[in-house]
């Protein structure tokens, strides 16, 4: 692992982080993805269980298909919970829903999707 590429201190990373809802569509180098996944598996977790796996998708066609399914599922959940069928139904001032809707709309354009797959302790491996 090439940790020299991580130029930011831990404190700076923790205290300056922010949510990113607008992402560049640029491809992410495999080396960067590997570095992030290596950091993820080194992070503390409950009971020190390292039972997870990662599924990394960088194929544009698959991401576009996933993005469409994600958006469809997002709106289905809003319809079930609130009766909303589109942006016009979101009450004014519901900024969290507007931001989440933006992510649902943009999911098709992200450069990479990482699925974290877990297995409960004593459970069978499955997706």
Question: How should each PLM-predicted stretch be described?
Answer:
Residues 33, 42, 73-77:
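Short, low-complexity, polar/charged sequence segments that are solvent-exposed and flexible
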Residues 50, 56-127:
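Glycine/small-residue-rich phosphate/adenosyl-binding loop
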Residues 1-38, 50:
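Specificity-determining recognition surfaces
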Residues 43-49:
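Glycine-rich phosphate/pyrophosphate-binding beta-alpha loops
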Residues 16, 39-42, 69-72:
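Residues within well-ordered alpha-helical secondary structure of globular protein domains
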């Amino acid at each position: 692992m090439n940790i020299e590429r991580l130029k930011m201190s831990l404190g700076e990373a923790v205290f300056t982080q922010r949510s990113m809802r607008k992402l560049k569509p640029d491809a992410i180098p495999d080396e960067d993805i590997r570095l992030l996944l290596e950091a993820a598996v080194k992070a503390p977790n409950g009971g020190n269980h390292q039972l997870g796996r990662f599924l990394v998708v960088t194929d544009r066609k698959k991401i576009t298909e996933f993005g469409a399914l994600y958006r469809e599922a997002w709106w289905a959940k809003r319809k079930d919970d609130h009766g909303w069928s589109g942006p016009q139904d979101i009450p004014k001032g519901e900024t969290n829903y507007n931001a989440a809707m933006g992510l649902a709309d943009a999911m098709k354009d992200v450069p990479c999707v990482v699925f974290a797959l877990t297995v409960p302790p004593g459970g069978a491996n499955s997706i």
